[in-house]
């Protein structure tokens, strides 16, 4: 089992750790966060307003974080180059600070003895992988990779199924997206993105997202055919993608439902879900899929023009894919 270090114990860092313990697929051996001391880590890991209390034991002991009896080394370095991952036995590092997202910055982890780095965010220059879509293109010459964004992980599997079966001529995506930590509780300064600084709990905020364009990086045939935007809405978690696209081959909406359902039960099982239930966002809280197609919510204008709806837990679904990507990478060692 691959030994993993986590840099940044925020929403994704903590939930990747939860996903690792829930699944037993990877071994968390070290955590680095300069802003959270050990006792605070215990508290933050144990109690979660969104996903509930951790079902297991967590305590501080001899300067280590102990989860379900397993000791985890704790570092508090600001500079990733100074983290002694090698000493802790960490082979892979999950870079989940949101700060070190380029090859150069994430590469600093290699200096401390890590063998590979998985960036839990989109990257300007690191190769991006989406499980179920292009993970087979990974080869072990790559030291630094990106797991793309939660929204790309929702959109890409759906876009792949639609494109493989009917061909996407072009498409526009909107994600109606839950609040994240970068937003403000009340109006405040936000650099050049003025709208992003408005109170998160009281506004629908139009925002940019690179998620749709990033699909073109993981599915090259769709490069230049998709773009999109986001609305940030006052919910704490779970988001939904609305993909409106023009199809090359004519398809009835029932044909689309059929191929998505088949994919969800076959090659994309566990990644792409399918539901015909009358669901709302809360129903996907703590769901581990990257994407769940909502058969009842989509509409067709005609046989070539459709609006497709897919839900995702933008925190927990994504965190589970980070774990799955590391398992896949380890299988290639």
Swiss-Prot record:
Which residues are recorded with the post-translational modification ADP-ribosylcysteine? 150
Name the record gives this protein:
Glyceraldehyde-3-phosphate dehydrogenase
**What does the annotation say about its assembly with partners?**
Homotetramer. Interacts with TPPP; the interaction is direct. Interacts (when S-nitrosylated) with SIAH1; leading to nuclear translocation. Interacts with RILPL1/GOSPEL, leading to prevent the interaction between GAPDH and SIAH1 and prevent nuclear translocation. Interacts with CHP1; the interaction increases the binding of CHP1 with microtubules. Associates with microtubules. Interacts with EIF1AD, USP25, PRKCI and WARS1. Interacts with phosphorylated RPL13A; inhibited by oxidatively-modified low-densitity lipoprotein (LDL(ox)). Component of the GAIT complex.
Q: Which GO terms describe its cellular component?
A: cytoplasm; cytosol; GAIT complex; microtubule cytoskeleton; nucleus
Crosslinked residue numbers (Glycyl lysine isopeptide (Lys-Gly) (interchain with G-Cter in SUMO2)): 184
Give one GO term, molecular function aspect.
NAD binding
Q: Please list the residues that carry the modification N6-acetyllysine.
A: 59, 192, 217, 225, 252
Chain sites annotated for binding NAD(+): 11-12, 33, 78, 120, 314
- Which residues bear the site annotation Activates thiol group during catalysis? 177
Q: Does Oxidoreductase count among this protein's keywords?
A: yes
The organism that produces this protein has a lineage beginning with: Eukaryota, Metazoa, Chordata, Craniata, Vertebrata
- Using the record's annotations, give every residue carrying the modification N6,N6-dimethyllysine: 3, 64, 192, 213, 225, 258, 261, 332
Name its species.
Answer: Spermophilus citellus (European ground squirrel)
Positions carrying Cysteine persulfide are 150
**Modulation of this protein's activity:** Glyceraldehyde-3-phosphate dehydrogenase activity is inhibited by fumarate, via the formation of S-(2-succinyl)cysteine residues.
Deamidated asparagine-modified residues are where? 7, 62, 68, 147, 153, 223, 314
């Amino acid at each position: 089992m691959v030994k993993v270090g986590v840099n940044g114990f925020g929403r994704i860092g903590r939930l990747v750790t939860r996903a690792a313990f829930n699944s037993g697929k990877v071994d968390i051996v070290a955590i680095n966060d300069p802003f959270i001391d050990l006792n605070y880590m215990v508290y933050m890991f144990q109690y979660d307003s969104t996903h509930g209390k951790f079902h297991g034991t967590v305590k501080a002991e001899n300067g280590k974080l102990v989860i379900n009896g397993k000791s985890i080394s704790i570092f508090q370095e600001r500079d990733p180059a100074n983290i002694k991952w090698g000493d802790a036995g960490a082979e892979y590092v999950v870079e989940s600070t949101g700060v070190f997202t380029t090859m150069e910055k994430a590469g600093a982890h290699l200096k401390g003895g890590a063998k590979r780095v998985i960036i839990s965010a989109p990257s300007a220059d690191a190769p991006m992988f989406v499980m179920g879509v292009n993970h087979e293109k990974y080869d072990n010459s790559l030291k630094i990779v990106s797991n793309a964004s939660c929204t790309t992980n929702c959109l890409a599997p759906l876009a792949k199924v639609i494109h493989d079966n009917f061909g996407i001529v072009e498409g526009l995506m909107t994600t109606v997206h839950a609040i994240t930590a970068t937003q403000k509780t009340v109006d405040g300064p936000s650099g050049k993105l003025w709208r992003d600084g408005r109170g998160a709990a009281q506004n629908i905020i139009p925002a940019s997202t690179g998620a749709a364009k990033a699909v073109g990086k993981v599915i090259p045939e769709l490069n230049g055919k998709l773009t999109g935007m986001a609305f940030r809405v006052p919910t704490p978690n779970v988001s939904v993608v609305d993909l409106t696209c023009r199809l090359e081959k004519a398809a009835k909406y029932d044909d689309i439902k059929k191929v998505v359902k088949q994919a969800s039960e076959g090659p994309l099982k566990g990644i792409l879900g399918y539901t015909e239930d009358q669901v709302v966002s809360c129903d996907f809280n703590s769901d581990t899929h990257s994407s769940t197609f909502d058969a009842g919510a989509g509409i067709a204008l005609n046989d070539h023009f459709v609006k497709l709806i897919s839900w995702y837990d933008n925190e927990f679904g994504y965190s589970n894919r980070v774990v799955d990507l590391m398992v896949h990478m380890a299988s290639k060692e």
